[in-house]
Regions:
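Helix-loop boundary and gating motifs at the non-cytosolic
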Residues: 3-50
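Helix-to-loop junctions at the C-terminal end of transmembrane segments
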Residues: 56-68, 153
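Helix-breaking motifs and short loop linkers at transmembrane-helix boundaries and internal kinks
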Residues: 68, 89-94
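C-terminal ends and interior cores of transmembrane alpha-helices
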Residues: 78-91
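Paired small-residue
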Residues: 94-102
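Intracellular juxtamembrane helix-capping segments at the cytosolic ends
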Residues: 109-122
């Protein structure tokens, strides 16, 4: 029980991170449609996120080793929040591609920092149990993110601000 309490903030953080980034993709798609982006442009914007995610997967371990779990997480969350907040300020195709690369990179690095921290904190006896709780929180965040789309208004600054607040 004490282990669960010690990692509960981390588990809630994972859920919120997944909520914020999970809602960004659909919000970007709906906003891009309203802005008149072509279907190909919308697809490229979506792919840009995963391009950044792949880059983050390769670069994250070195960053975590170099600066530590907490600093790596904080820097990448700040990058993600900045990229989210820039969407309504620069509503252009190339800017959104760049922002989505940044969010993908940031999320991959954030997940790497969290998961490696958990691996370091947990023991062989409780790792499976706590990683199942971790995945449950992760998936709950993704599920809630899809429900957020109902209240988020495409292109509105407020919608992107809400996602940035959730990511904080």
């Amino acid at each position: 029980m004490t282990t669960l309490l010690s990692i509960s903030a981390l588990l809630i953080t994972v859920m919120l991170m997944q909520m914020g980034t999970g809602a960004l993709g659909p919000l970007d798609t709906l906003s891009a449609i309203e802005l008149g982006f072509s279907n190909i442009q919308i697809g490229v914007i979506g792919a840009a996120h995963f391009t950044g995610f792949i880059i983050g997967c390769f670069g994250a371990p070195a960053l975590v080793r170099r600066v530590g779990h907490a600093r790596a997480y904080i820097v990448t969350v700040a990058l993600s929040i900045t990229a989210v907040l820039l969407h309504p300020i620069f509503p252009t195709f190339w800017a959104w591609c760049l922002f989505r690369v940044f969010t993908g990179l940031a999320i991959a690095t954030s997940f790497t920092a969290v998961e490696s921290w958990l691996n370091a904190k947990l023991t062989r006896q409780n790792r499976g149990r706590f990683f199942s709780i971790y995945r449950l929180m992760d998936m709950m965040g993704a599920l809630i993110a899809q429900s957020l789309i109902v209240i988020l208004i495409p292109i509105e600054n407020l919608s992107y601000m809400i996602l940035a607040i959730i990511l904080c």
